[in-house]
């Protein structure tokens, strides 16, 4: 459980790569920027971890030394709403991600549940619950007890991942926690976050359905986003103020509810915008 709001990037920032920093260097470099979270990107993985156990352990050790919380973004090639063979392959990919998360002491594996395809929302939900229960059961067999699985709210209406669906999954399946991607919700609902109350509603619904601890320690993604009638198109930086949502509104709600979320920047300016979000919240907490 976080003792304060934490901020960090989704993946290794370009400036770090430019210096040829190793993965194990990332926590120290983030700490030097005043950031304290990092979401490792495993988005192209298959059915086996694509990181050596030794390297994952080294990342976890350096993260602990620098008080940087780790999460892991799972494979994009997961679809629990697909045909049987697709679902089976998806389960193996998610288990591989959970295995690596355990090695590096990441506390949550974020993943996209899938696309409705020809299935009804009810059938898609039932399939996701069944598959996710089997994944969590397999994790238990493997001794993976300290990693939660985090289904993410999604940015297109063709994708399984409305706020209600994600909260519903977490009500039905143990060892899960919701991942609230504010930009995805904004795009999915065609500009949902216009006022502070729009953010309050998400926080209140999450608390009502999953409890105080679930909302107090939310794992979140944030960026400004461009969208069309089909949902999310692309991410924008915090300086591109003609795109929403407005982080200042979320900062106000975070301070008001005394939340301690982990907020991962998915902006094109990964760590730069994570710092801007952190500073915005700090100003709000002091006001």
Feature map (PLM): residue ranges:
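Acidic/histidine-rich catalytic cores of soluble enzymes
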Residues: 135-232
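A short, acidic, amphipathic alpha-helical segment used as a generic capping/interface helix at domain edges
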Residues: 201-212, 239-256
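N-terminal pre-domain/capping segments
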Residues: 1-99, 287
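Alpha-helix N-cap and loop-to-helix initiation/capping positions
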Residues: 18-22, 50-58, 82-93, 119-131, ...
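Active-site beta-loop-alpha junctions enriched in small/polar residues
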Residues: 10-15, 41-45, 75-77, 114-116, ...
């Amino acid at each position: 459980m976080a003792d304060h709001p934490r901020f960090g990037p989704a993946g290794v920032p370009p400036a770090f790569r430019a210096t040829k920093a190793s993965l194990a260097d990332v926590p120290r470099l983030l700490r030097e920027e005043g950031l304290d979270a990092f979401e490792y990107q495993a988005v192209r993985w298959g059915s086996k971890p694509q990181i050596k156990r030794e390297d994952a352990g080294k990342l976890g050790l350096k993260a602990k030394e620098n008080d940087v919380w780790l999460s892991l973004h799972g494979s994009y090639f997961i679809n629990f709403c697909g045909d049987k063979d697709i679902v089976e392959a998806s389960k193996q990919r998610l288990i591989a991600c959970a295995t690596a998360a355990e090695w590096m002491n990441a506390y949550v594996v974020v993943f996209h549940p899938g696309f409705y395809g020809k299935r009804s929302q009810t059938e898609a939900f039932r399939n996701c619950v069944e598959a996710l229960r089997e994944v969590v059961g397999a994790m238990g067999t493997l001794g993976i007890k300290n990693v939660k699985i985090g289904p993410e709210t999604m940015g297109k209406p063709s994708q399984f991942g409305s706020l209600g669906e994600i909260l519903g999954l977490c009500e039905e399946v143990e060892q899960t926690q919701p991942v609230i991607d504010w930009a995805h919700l904004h795009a999915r609902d065609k500009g949902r976050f216009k006022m502070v109350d729009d953010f309050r509603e998400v926080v209140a619904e999450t608390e009502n359905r999953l409890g105080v601890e679930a909302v107090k320690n939310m794992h979140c993604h944030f960026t400004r986003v461009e969208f069309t009638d089909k949902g999310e198109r692309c991410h924008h930086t915090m300086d591109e103020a003609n795109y929403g949502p407005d982080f200042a509104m979320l900062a106000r709600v975070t301070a008001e509810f005394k939340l301690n979320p982990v907020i991962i920047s998915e902006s094109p300016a990964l760590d730069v915008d994570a710092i801007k979000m952190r500073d915005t919240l700090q100003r709000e907490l002091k006001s």
